Swiss-Prot record:
Assembly mode: Homodimer.
Gene Ontology CC terms: cytosol
Organism: Pectobacterium atrosepticum (strain SCRI 1043 / ATCC BAA-672) (Erwinia carotovora subsp. atroseptica)
Annotated residues for binding of Mg(2+) 2: 100, 104, 151
Recorded family membership: Belongs to the Nudix hydrolase family. NudK subfamily.
Protein name: GDP-mannose pyrophosphatase
Motif Nudix box positions after renumbering to this chain: 86-106
Gene it is expressed from: nudK
Length: 193
């Protein structure tokens, strides 16, 4: 199958935090025509996220941390409630999420279940996020969490029902976290009886 595009130009715009390129390309349309488009693509690498849950207690582990993009887009405090997550760097998705779980939440989860992967903002960002879930209990507690280096992460253990209420009333606004909580509902992890 031939490529649907011909890249005419690729220009590096920034590589300070992640990589931002400008692409000029000719897109072959279904009707046979060709249209030239110009897009900026932000390459931040792929990532992984996990919902830690305890079925017996009816709880989930979430984190709260400052996110500058939310602050500049109307979130007064900049703080965001979210599931543990991180960039893959040079790790497999499974290795990454186990490491992130220990660093951010303090739980050393061994058995992680891969749920799915998804492009989170495909209109301008390359990132594909790998979604996982794992059961936790106090025997898996390795440390107090909170992140590493310049991270300042608060670890929260919440009743699943409260997390769902927070999602429904807008206190949880993070897309990956909403997807994981909805997945828990679909799978019936906290269904009564």
């Amino acid at each position: 199958m031939s490529s649907p595009i011909d890249i005419v130009e690729k220009k590096l715009l920034s590589d300070h935090w992640f990589i931002l390129h400008k692409y000029v390309f000719d897109l072959k349309r279904k009707n046979g025509g060709v249209v030239r488009q110009i897009r900026e693509v932000y390459d931040r690498g792929d990532g992984a996220t996990i919902l830690l849950y305890n079925r017996a207690k009816g709880t989930v582990i979430l984190t709260r941390q400052f996110r500058i993009p939310t602050y500049v887009n109307g979130n007064e405090s900049g703080m965001l409630l979210e599931a543990c997550a991180g960039l893959l760097d040079d790790y497999s998705p499974e290795e990454c999420i186990r490491n992130e779980a220990i660093e951010e939440t303090g739980y050393a989860v061994g058995n992680v279940e891969k749920l799915f992967d998804a492009y989170m903002s495909p209109g301008g960002v390359t990132e594909r996020l790998h979604f996982f879930a794992a059961e936790y209990d106090e025997s898996l507690r390795d440390n107090s969490g909170g992140g590493v280096e310049d991270e300042d992460i608060e670890v929260l253990e919440l009743p699943f029902s409260e997390a769902i209420a927070m999602m429904n009333d807008g206190r949880i606004k993070d897309g990956k976290t909403i997807m994981l909580l909805q997945h828990a509902i679909i799978r019936g992890w906290f269904a009564k009886g």
